[in-house]
From Swiss-Prot:
Function: The RuvA-RuvB-RuvC complex processes Holliday junction (HJ) DNA during genetic recombination and DNA repair. Endonuclease that resolves HJ intermediates. Cleaves cruciform DNA by making single-stranded nicks across the HJ at symmetrical positions within the homologous arms, yielding a 5'-phosphate and a 3'-hydroxyl group; requires a central core of homology in the junction. The consensus cleavage sequence is 5'-(A/T)TT(C/G)-3'. Cleavage occurs on the 3'-side of the TT dinucleotide at the point of strand exchange.
Cell compartment(s), UniProt: Cytoplasm
Organism: Rhizobium johnstonii (strain DSM 114642 / LMG 32736 / 3841)
Protein name per the record: Crossover junction endodeoxyribonuclease RuvC
GO biological process, one term: DNA recombination
One annotated GO molecular function: magnesium ion binding
CDD domains, alphabetized: RuvC
Length: 169
């Protein structure tokens, strides 16, 4: 009998950080919950990061995932925005790590490949595949959908991640 593993996927962002919780047992996936943690754009950066931290900490505390997956960020032309996104991503990695969860990271094209079969695709393709893979899925907005896709990517890759860690250790 396969163990059920609960995974939280996190799509970091300073304005909106998406989160999605799934359970995986063998090859089956089950939707648990999803949503978005927001920060107040009128507040200073430190306060906004605290809002993201507190919101994600509540999600991890409430849903008690076993593992976490966070999307890697990309560098864009706006260096200041990239740095702020990196800080939000730090919070997205810190919260589950402080809760004792192993945290894996995935590039955006790896997430798309795991969900839609190719490394480049549209948001609508991700939404459609989420509904096919988990018929009871519910998400409001792209951030929550992306977070669920990140969790699915981790579910597909977690065995190979464990193998790499064992070989490296």
């Amino acid at each position: 009998m396969q163990n059920t593993i609960r995974i939280v996927g996190i799509d970091p962002g300073l304005r909106r950080t998406g989160w999605g919780i799934i359970e995986t047992s063998g090859n089956s996936l089950r939707f648990v919950a999803s949503g978005t943690v927001t920060s107040d754009g009128d507040m200073d950066l430190a306060s906004r990061l605290c809002q993201l931290h507190d919101g994600l900490a509540e999600i991890v505390h409430s849903y008690k995932p076993d593992e976490a997956a966070v999307e890697q960020t990309f560098v864009n032309k706006d260096a200041v925005a990239t740095l702020k996104l990196g800080q939000a991503r730090g919070i997205a990695m810190l919260v589950p790590a402080r809760a004792g969860l192993p945290v894996s990271e995935y590039a955006p094209n790896a997430v798309k490949k795991a969900v839609i079969g190719v490394g480049h695709g549209e948001k609508q393709q991700i939404h459609m595949m989420l509904k096919i893979l988990m018929p009871k899925v519910e998400f409001k907005g792209n951030d929550a959908a992306d977070a669920l896709a990140i969790a699915i990517c981790h579910a597909h890759n977690r065995g190979s991640n464990r193998m790499r860690q064992a070989l490296a250790g």
